[in-house]
Amino acid sequence: METGGLSAAALANGDLGSQRERTLVPERLQKREHERQLEVERRKQKRQDQEVEEEKSDFFAAAFARERSAVEELLESGESVERLEEAAARLQGLQKLINDSVLFLAAYDLRQAQEVLARLQAALAKRRQELQPKKRFAFKTRKKDAASATQVASAPDAPAAEGSLTSPPPLKEEGDFDSSWICGFSNLQSQVLEKRAEELHQQDVLLTQLRNCTIKLYGNPNTLRLTKAQGCTLLCGPVSTSVFLEDCSDCVLAVACQQLRVHTTKDTRIFLQVTSRAIMEDCTGIQFAPYTWSYPGIDKDFEGSGLDKNKNNWNDVDDFNWLARDVASPNWNVLPEEERRIQWD
């Protein structure tokens, strides 16, 4: 009887086990099918995203080429102020197109576009100078010699031979603007130097061979270069295109721009607003923080510069001397928050 009872119990348990397995099989199949559907959807979404990115890149390439061609044609035949102003307006549009495309453009394509834009900006500045050099520098409130309109202004109370720059040093990359570098300071030490909006508007500014100086640029330059500076503080309003920094040490900068390029520079802090990215090469001890300088009228200068004040990639830095993507570059770091509290004025 017991044997029969055990056999019956075993059979009953076996039936229950089989029933449980039959119940679990559909659950496993359903789970597997659900995972398969999720994977299909993920791949589909990935394909769609890729197609959207390709469409955006194609649109950018076509729009950029069209506007570039139009600007080049205007500059080649720019025998009137009106045509040059049209070229300037189109360049502002090109700049906005680049700014709006930063997130989906490949790094190489972005650099190429920025270099083309910088060259066109330089060509525009040169054509403006050729067409109306006197009118460009005839400021009503200035009390300088007429001769000073063709050279870089010297600092207050500094001899003209010391503070003015008549032949800028050779530039090593796309910033080679030659005679358009006609605004700035040079060969000065331990001075406070300033330029206002009417002097800076869409100018190419060159600051070179300065030591222990504080430079304040209240306005909207086209480009800005600081070279061979030591122990200087540079505060600048929004720069429409690029800021170049080279051969500098122990400096502090507050700059807003479309692109920042830093070469052969060390032990420098940069408070940055940049709509694309910062690029550095042959540098050490560089620290980055968000741009915090302000002055009356800066919002208007941002508007005129074409920069998006709400877009800031201050910590998106390409170090050309550091190719390892999974390890942070030892040549730069983010400035700690407790060290960012600076009273600029």
Swiss-Prot record:
InterPro entries: C-CAP_CF_C-like, CAP/MinC_C, CARP_motif, TBCC, TBCC_N, TBCC_N_sf, Tubulin-bd_cofactor_C_dom. One of its GO terms (cellular component) is endoplasmic reticulum. Residues 18-50 have a biased composition (Basic and acidic residues). Keywords: Acetylation, Chaperone, Cytoplasm, Phosphoprotein. Gene3D superfamilies: 2.160.20.70, Tubulin Binding Cofactor C, N-terminal domain. Belongs to the TBCC family. Supercomplex made of cofactors A to E. Cofactors A and D function by capturing and stabilizing tubulin in a quasi-native conformation. Cofactor E binds to the cofactor D-tubulin complex; interaction with cofactor C then causes the release of tubulin polypeptides that are committed to the native state. This is Tubulin-specific chaperone C. The gene is TBCC.
